[in-house]
A protein has these predicted regions:
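Charged catalytic cores and adjacent phosphate/nucleic-acid-binding surfaces used
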Residues: 191-275, 281, 285-290, 310-375, ...
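Generic structural signal for well-ordered, non-membrane alpha-helical segments
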Residues: 3-6, 23-26, 158, 162, ...
Length: 606
């Protein structure tokens, strides 16, 4: 096992022990052990295990050292397996309900016999949770809302998690000899934060072998549909995938149609009808009567659809009726439009902009020159400073911004003033050493306290290259209070960036109440950058705000909020948000070269 995997097991052991009401010192020992393991370089961990010296490390000891060595060597731990077996499976599931921790779960189990989601739901609906000391009616309401959200969330999946699944399937489809073209479609192709299912469009010379390959994919739990040109499967993860096979001349039309969105497709069909054409997944063909440039009634759309359906089969190229296109750019051109990137197809003005030639040149991954808001083992990160910088350098980045947690984030090992000063000195020495070509900026993810003050004093903040101000506590404030709190932090002269504006955790936690418009206006007025937090669970500030905000002058920075080297790749999902928000390269701070970035931060510090 790697150090990260070992730490995950140790943290799970701590949770299980807490659920079983074991000695708190024992719980803390496993939590501390996980942090120590995270702080090792992989090579150092290997050396300590091989030499039998783990027990000599402060915070580990003999018994824990043996368990870590067992995990590192065999990939499993008998103690862990027995502990899991001793706890009802539903108890771990309860930890996924927002607001429930081990202590509350223990009370619910002892007082109300709660052992899983079903018994918790019943206890809430009967009002028994509200009667418990330390809970009350509001807590009961929050628990029920959390259960409801969890059920809704369970039908969706993070873009980041399903994108590699889709890529693997597309690659496999393209390798089949019968397949001429294959692409993913749907919300995944549009870069939407969460995805309900996967859609694949394929042009093939022979259908049956392709369908058979698809339904036989590894991890398929159930084949939910199988027809002559379609198939649907559900994976063991709950993710559903749909396959549609079309003649090659219909491929582009099907790809456009099933990419969506629904609103975009309606506008495209209206535009086609206004030109005497019918646009569908089958093709682009003349209809009997055309409308005007104004909005076309839905009855006209229905008539056009019926006209397509009444044909004996999909129109083929060469019959002098269907427009022949080789790609989506030609499809848009046939309707007098510039190509609309999939990320923009949400029915929010992209068709009009494409007609006027006003679509932006969207930011791309290759435009990024570095990043900010990254954590190390100094707080709750899983890799050391040097490991993180080496990973940034391997990506070709010119700069890398450290931003470990501030002192009030005790749960994340936030840095005291003394520890932060030590880190600033360490970064300065690393830059001076010439060990890396990538320049390191010293920073902090500084807590915005409940009253809007920052977590460090001005003198210490002035020693940093940049400051990311973020809310990490007291999420229950009303909208006016939370908005004023964040604006006060924005108005602090040392604040460089605002972190994760709404605090949402996708599929887990709703955003706190905040007036995003007022916060955006305050950021613009004070020259504060608002980050696109690219963590797949956050993607905050969300794309729907960015077009108008950027037009007003708001500057963004695509930050991964990385806690380990592999998470630097999260910027890919942040680029999705930026593109969906119509952002150009020049509207994203970390597309700038090192020189201009250093100068900007120098001037910002005053």
């Amino acid at each position: 096992m790697t150090k990260h995997e070992i730490a995950d097991v140790l943290n799970e052991i701590a949770l299980l022990l807490e659920l079983k009401a074991e000695n708190p010192f024992k719980v803390r020992a496993y939590q501390a052990g996980a942090r120590v393991v995270e702080s090792f370089e992989e090579a150092e961990l290997q050396r300590l295990v091989s030499a039998g010296e783990l027990k000599t490390v402060k915070g580990i000891g003999d018994a824990l050292g043996q368990k870590i060595a067992e995990l590192h060597t065999t990939g499993k731990l008998e103690f862990h397996e027995k502990l899991k077996a001793s706890v009802p499976p539903g108890m771990m599931e309860l930890l996924q309900v927002p607001g429930l921790g081990p202590k509350k779960i223990k009370v619910l189990g002892e007082k109300l016999g709660v052992v899983d989601i079903a018994t918790l739901t019943k206890a809430c609906e009967e009002g028994r949770v509200a009667e418990l000391a330390g809970f009350g009616a509001k807590t009961q309401e929050k628990i029920l809302a959390g259960i409801k959200n969890r059920e809704a969330y369970g039908r969706r999946h993070l873009w980041w998690e399903v994108f590699p699944v889709s890529e693997t399937i597309v690659k496999g489809l393209r390798a089949l000899p019968q397949v001429k073209r294959a692409e993913s479609a749907g919300s995944l192709r549009r870069g939407v934060e969460t995805v309900g299912d996967l859609d694949f469009i394929v042009a093939a010379t022979d259908v049956e072998p392709v369908v058979e390959w698809f339904v036989s994919l590894a991890g398929v739990k159930e084949v939910t549909a199988r027809g002559e040109t379609k198939a649907s499967v559900r994976f063991v993860t709950g993710l559903q995938a749909d396959l549609r096979i079309v003649p090659e001349e219909q491929f582009v039309f099907a790809l456009h149609h099933f990419t969506g969105s629904k609103d975009h497709n309606v506008q495209m069909r209206q535009r086609a009808l206004a030109r005497g054409l019918s646009l569908s997944e089958w093709g682009l063909s003349p209809v009997a009567e055309s409308g005007s440039e104004s909005a076309v009634p839905s009855s006209k759309l229905q008539e056009a659809d019926e006209a397509v359906k009444k044909r004996k089969g999909p129109k083929r190229a060469g019959n002098n009726e269907s427009v022949v296109v080789a790609n989506e750019a030609e499809l848009f051109k046939a309707l007098g439009l510039a190509f609309v990137p999939p990320e923009l197809r949400e029915g929010v003005g992209e068709v009009e902009a494409a007609e006027k030639g006003e679509l932006p040149r969207l930011v791309e991954m290759t435009d990024l020159r570095g990043t900010f808001h990254c954590h190390t083992t100094a707080s709750d990160g899983r890799n050391t400073l040097k490991e993180m910088v080496a990973a940034a350098e391997a990506l070709g980045w010119a700069y890398f911004g450290v931003a470990d947690h501030s002192k009030s984030s005790v749960q994340a090992k936030g840095l005291t003033e003394e520890r932060l000063l030590k880190q600033i000195a360490e970064i300065a020495a690393l830059n001076a050493s010439g060990q890396f070509k990538t320049h390191v900026f010293s920073g902090t993810e500084c807590d915005i306290l409940p009253d809007g003050r920052l977590d460090y004093d001005d003198g210490l903040l002035a020693k940093l290259d940049y400051v990311v101000a973020s809310v990490h506590s007291t999420f229950s404030q009303d909208e006016a209070t939370m908005t004023a709190r964040i604006i006060r932090a924005i108005e602090h002269p040392r604040t460089t960036m605002l972190g994760h504006l709404t605090g949402r955790i996708l599929l887990r936690r709703e955003p706190y109440k905040v007036d995003a418009r007022k916060v955006i206006d305050a950021a613009i007025a004070n020259g504060v950058i608002v980050e696109i937090n690219a963590s797949p669970w956050r993607l905050d500030m969300e794309w729907k705000h960015w077009r108008k905000a950027a037009e007003k002058g708001l500057l963004s920075s695509i930050n991964p909020d990385a806690h380990e080297t592999g998470e630097l790749a999260y910027v890919r999902s942040g680029v999705n948000v930026a593109r969906k928000g119509w952002l150009r390269k020049e509207q994203v701070f970390n597309t700038r070269e090192l020189g201009p970035v250093r100068e900007y931060l120098r001037k910002r510090r005053g």
